[in-house]
Regions:
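Generic, ordered loop/turn and secondary-structure boundary motif
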Residues: 8, 15, 31, 35-37, ...
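Short amphipathic alpha-helix segments
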Residues: 10-26
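Short, glycine/acidic-enriched capping/hinge loops at junctions between secondary-structure elements
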Residues: 17, 40, 55-57
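A generic structural signal for short, non-catalytic loop/turn and secondary-structure boundary residues
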Residues: 22, 37, 62-65
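Amphipathic, hydrophobic secondary-structure cores in small proteins
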Residues: 1, 26-46
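Helix N-cap motif at beta-to-alpha junctions
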Residues: 9-12, 47-52
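Short glycine-/aliphatic-rich beta-strand segments at the starts of folded cytosolic domains
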Residues: 3-6
Length: 85
């Protein structure tokens, strides 16, 4: 299980990753899962243990292109994506 932060802007995705990196949060840029309706093809993947810190950082930034946070659960049958915020 991991979490994804979705944005409607590639530049905002890169900016958010830089901010998370600067705060010591391990994250990576991934292709946005098709289940997430976003105008941008890139999202930020991060660990479940960092969810509260990432939510706090996003609440301070308040990016206008922020789509939401999503929980991604994968198993041998596929994946389930749930919007959490």
């Amino acid at each position: 299980m991991y979490y994804v932060a979705g944005f409607n802007s590639r530049s905002d995705s890169f900016r958010f990753k830089q901010i998370l990196d600067g705060n010591g949060i391990f994250c990576s840029i991934i292709e946005t899962p098709f289940e997430i309706n976003s105008a941008c093809s890139l999202s930020i993947k991060f660990l479940a243990s960092d969810l509260n810190a990432v939510r706090f950082i996003e609440s301070r930034i308040k990016s206008s292109s922020f789509v939401g946070f999503f929980k991604v659960e994968e198993n041998k049958f596929g994946r389930k994506i749930t919007r959490i915020y």
